[in-house]
């Protein structure tokens, strides 16, 4: 009986993990503020973006590289720094991270702060190249 109970616990744990991963994916991908990498590239090339914002950690940026000319403000520091660095709420911002999750959170925060031209991509900076 214990063996069957252990197996059931592992099945439940696996289902919870899959559900969490799927939920995280859904969160990163489905938002009115998400733009495709292709659209973001087009916006950048046509000078329709003022700031390319990297919200990854220092270690991620130094290890994995970054988009040339991007501004680095780790997600944890965003609310404290963005208004000081970019007081104009009309600033056109594209946000990126590694998976889209933090970029979405940052974009939601920017929208709440009044930066209504903030958008994000749900892929890495390399997709903008």
What residue ranges belong to the model's regions?
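Surface-exposed beta-strand edges and their flanking turn/coil or helix-capping segments
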Residues: 50, 66-68, 108, 118
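Catalytic cysteine-centered active loop of the rhodanese-like fold, especially the PTP/DSP P-loop
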Residues: 79-129
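Flexible, polar/low-complexity N-terminal or interdomain linker segments that lie immediately upstream
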Residues: 2-66
């Amino acid at each position: 009986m214990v063996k069957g109970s252990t197996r059931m616990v592992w099945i439940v744990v696996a289902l919870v993990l899959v559900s969490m991963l799927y939920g995280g994916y859904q969160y990163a991908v489905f938002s009115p503020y998400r733009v495709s990498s292709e659209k973001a590239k087009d916006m950048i090339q046509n000078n329709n973006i003022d700031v390319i914002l990297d919200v990854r950690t220092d270690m991620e940026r130094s290890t994995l590289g970054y988009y040339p000319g991007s501004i680095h403000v780790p997600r944890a520091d965003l609310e404290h720094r963005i208004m000081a660095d970019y007081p104009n709420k009309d600033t056109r911002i594209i946000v990126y991270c590694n998976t889209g999750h933090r970029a979405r959170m940052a974009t939601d925060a920017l929208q709440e702060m009044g930066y209504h031209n903030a958008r994000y991509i749900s892929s890495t900076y390399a997709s903008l190249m």
